[in-house]
Amino acid sequence: GSLNDQMAKSISGAMGEVAASKFLGIKFEYHCNVGGVPDLIFKDLKLQVRTQLPKSNNKNSLIIRQKAEQNQFYILVIDEAPKFKILGFVNSTYVLGQEQWKTTFGLDRPFCYSIPPEKLTPINLLKDSTWN
C-alpha cells in the first residue's frame, strides 16, 4: 500500500496495543513493528497484538504467521476508532501445525493460520489468569 496506508496501519496497530495494555493494566512500551519482540509482557507472558479494521463481510480473524514462536499469546483487537474491541486471545502453541486453521485466503502467498473470533478465549480470562 501507499505510505499513508502503511502509516495508518502502524498507528492503528499501536492503538490496539494501547487498548490491550490499558485493559490488562500494564504499561505500554511505545515500540512499533519490531520483529521478534513481543508487543506486550503480562505476568511473564509474551503477547502479540493483532489489530484490524472491521471487515465489511464481518469476517475478521486472528492471523498468526508460519514463523510464529510457540507459547506466545496472540490478541485480536478490532479498530473501530475511537473504540477498540478486544475479541479474545489464543496461545500460538495450540494453533501452529493445526491444519484446520491454515489458509492462503486464495492468494498466491505462503499460508498463515486464521482463527475466527468465536474460537478465541475471552480476554478477561487472560487478565484474571484463569484461562487454564
What are these regions (language model features)?
Residues 1-43, 50-132:
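Nucleic-acid endonuclease domains
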